[in-house]
Amino acid sequence: MKFLDEAKVYIRSGDGGNGCVAFRREKFIEFGGPSGGNGGRGGDVIVEVADGLNTLIDYRYQQHFKAPKGANGMGSDRHGANGKAIVLKVPLGTQIIDEDRETLIHDFTRVGERLVLAEGGNGGFGNAHFKSSTNRAPRRANPGQPGEERWIWLRLKLIADAGLVGLPNAGKSTFLSKVSAAKPKIADYPFTTLHPQLGVVRVQDREFVLADIPGLIEGAHEGAGLGDRFLGHVERCRVLLHLVDAGCDHAGRAYKIVRGEMEAYAGALAEKVEIVALNKIDAVTAEDLKKQRDRLKRAAKKTPLLVSGVTGEGVQDVLRALVEVIGQAPVSDKAKGADASAAQAMETPVARAKPWSP
């Protein structure tokens, strides 16, 4: 399935049905009085988090969603049927953003969470509603209220416990395939990974989700390479695993390039807990390995772990370090806010527009 993490869609809730002007007509009843029913309410547009989805690809082929309008009122005091709501299914971690691409409307963080994004219009009153002691035969009815319409952006930010970062061809996909059942594309050239990949990692009796994002290059925050758009997928992670290729020219400079891009990104990535590992140690000599390790240690100001995604050497040490940090690291403030808003949305019933009167 092709991965798509952003889509623009148009939504419109249903118009309310019109009220009806009608009078009761029966044998031997000369003045039957008004009997026009009210119009039905238009259908809502609802967004719901569905389990098992991990892409927004469905919204590439359909961008317009319109809920049906409410049925018109009829004689004999028959009210029109309400329009059926339409439900947009989205993956866990989806954000609803206004058309300006800046205003966050909602952040979905729980499976099954629902949000009424556009409420259907209220139905109009039939003439039976307007009868009174002074107006026994009203000949007026209201039209239904129009529905709401808007353009919105759907933006997916994958939810994972740990995220893999590094330069292109640092061995991130090989590491992910080694520690999980994920099967990312692996090749000996930069930018093999074009879309984020997720894998479930099991360590003894613990398991966590590991995300692999496409590699960063210098100037990514300005759009170089694949840009930094995929950094949002590790923004929710509790810990970052920074892999550096032991066979690169200078491990310290390679580390600083990625750190610079993370600091330039408009988020809290640079403040997250980071585990640094020197990868592909099987491909260099012992002398070069020591030299690269010292360079990386000076740049990162911490002792890097040594690992090989091909032979498996050092993999368990890295996984144990990740599990230890995941168990201690708190959820980021942004994720906390998202959880709080989601909890409030689930506990508080969605407010409905009050019935209008002429």
UniProtKB/Swiss-Prot annotation:
Its cofactor is Mg(2+). GO terms for cellular component: cytoplasm. Residues 1-159 form the Obg domain. Residues 160-327 form the OBG-type G domain. GO terms for molecular function: GTP binding; GTPase activity; magnesium ion binding. Keywords: Cytoplasm, GTP-binding, Hydrolase, Magnesium, Metal-binding, Nucleotide-binding. Transmembrane segments: none annotated. It holds the Pfam family GTP1_OBG. InterPro entries: G_OBG, GTP-bd, GTP-bd_Obg/CgtA, GTP1-OBG_CS, GTP1_OBG_dom, GTP1_OBG_dom_sf, OBG_GTPase, P-loop_NTPase. It comes from the Bacteria. The keyword Nucleotide-binding applies. Coiled coil: none annotated. Monomer. Belongs to the TRAFAC class OBG-HflX-like GTPase superfamily. OBG GTPase family. An essential GTPase which binds GTP, GDP and possibly (p)ppGpp with moderate affinity, with high nucleotide exchange rates and a fairly low GTP hydrolysis rate. Plays a role in control of the cell cycle, stress response, ribosome biogenesis and in those bacteria that undergo differentiation, in morphogenesis control. This is GTPase Obg. It comes from Nitrobacter winogradskyi (strain ATCC 25391 / DSM 10237 / CIP 104748 / NCIMB 11846 / Nb-255). The gene is obg.
